[in-house]
């Protein structure tokens, strides 16, 4: 993996399902590195094509930059040979640059560039932001389009022309027209990743737009179901996909939608259900209550 080019790694990411592990915390909310390392090894038994350490599901927004480096280093050291580990970079441009360099120094294989913190920006500003991060690392960079960093097709095209190591586009918006425009403009120049919460909900229509993979949060606690769902999607077994949506994914999303922030909290709850607890979420997120946890356990039984 160390000798693979950024585009070769991006191609591997696009060929299978992507793992976005939670970050384990102790009861005092400090990073539980031993538990995290053990879990990365456990997830490595399954057939993911990439591992995104300390991403949104991993509570990136609640981690300090030194903690992000610690998490990424642990993931790199514990991931199976041949499994690319992608590290996050975010916040303001200077911080994102530092995080990208840090990730490269501890052996990450790529960068997921999250939106800048808090502030709104023009397309010119977003382009300048991405260019600086790309210039700071030899790793391949995937931009995450969501929230206050929604890229137009013109901006993505300019970045693809200007940054040889821009290799991926992750969509967290869900605008079918915009995704169509970007794919029509750039085609196979980039790897496209679905990045909406519970991405399985959007996987079927997005596949037609060149989005061949997505970040699967449920892979954390029902990895076999997540892989089976993905394989059915890619093989055109729509009957399996629709049945899986009705049996698990849609009811799961109904539970997830009960409270803001549950897109992450429910993943750690799922880990608790399968007796692989990852500790509490950090504030400002909140954990599921006992009734919600029991409801989730009933859903998991259906697909386990």
From Swiss-Prot:
It catalyses: 5-dehydro-4-deoxy-D-glucarate + H(+) = 2,5-dioxopentanoate + CO2 + H2O. Pathway: Carbohydrate acid metabolism; D-glucarate degradation; 2,5-dioxopentanoate from D-glucarate: step 2/2. It is an enzyme of class 4 (lyase). The keyword Metal-binding does not apply. Pfam families: DHDPS. One of its GO terms (molecular function) is 4-hydroxy-tetrahydrodipicolinate synthase activity. Keywords: Lyase. Gene3D superfamilies: Aldolase class I. One of its GO terms (biological process) is D-glucarate catabolic process. InterPro entries: Aldolase_TIM, DapA-like, Dehydro-deoxyglucarate_dehyd. Belongs to the DapA family. This is Probable 5-dehydro-4-deoxyglucarate dehydratase. The lineage of its organism: Bacteria, Bacillati, Actinomycetota, Actinomycetes, Mycobacteriales.
């Amino acid at each position: 993996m160390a000798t693979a080019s950024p585009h070769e790694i991006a191609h591997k990411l696009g060929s299978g399902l992507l793992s976005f592990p939670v970050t384990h915390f102790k009861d005092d909310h400090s990073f539980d590195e031993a538990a995290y390392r053990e879990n990365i090894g456990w997830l490595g038994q399954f057939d993911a094509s990439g591992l995104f350490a300390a991403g949104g599901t991993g509570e990136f927004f609640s981690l300090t930059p030194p903690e992000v480096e610690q998490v990424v280093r642990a993931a790199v050291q514990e991931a199976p040979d041949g499994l690319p580990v992608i590290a996050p970079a975010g916040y303001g441009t200077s911080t994102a640059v530092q995080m990208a360099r840090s990730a490269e120094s501890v052996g990450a294989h790529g960068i997921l560039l999250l939106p800048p913190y808090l502030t709104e920006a023009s397309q010119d500003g977003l382009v300048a932001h991405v260019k600086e991060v790309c210039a700071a690392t030899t790793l391949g960079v995937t931009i995450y389009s969501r929230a206050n960093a929604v890229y137009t097709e013109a901006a993505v095209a300019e970045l693809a022309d200007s940054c040889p190591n821009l290799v991926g586009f992750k969509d967290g918006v869900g605008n079918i027209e915009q995704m169509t425009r970007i794919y029509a403009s750039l085609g196979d120049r980039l790897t496209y990743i679905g990045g909406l919460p519970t991405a399985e909900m959007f996987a079927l229509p997005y596949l037609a737009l060149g989005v061949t993979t997505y970040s699967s949060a449920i892979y954390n606690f029902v990895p076999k179901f997540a892989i089976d769902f993905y394989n059915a999607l890619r093989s055109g077994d729509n009957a399996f996909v629709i049945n899986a949506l009705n049996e698990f994914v849609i009811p799961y999303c109904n539970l997830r939608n009960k409270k803001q922030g549950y897109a992450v909290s429910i993943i750690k709850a799922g880990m608790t259900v399968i007796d692989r607890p990852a500790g509490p979420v950090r504030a400002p997120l909140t954990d599921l209550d006992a009734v919600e946890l029991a409801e989730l356990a009933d859903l998991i039984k259906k697909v386990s």
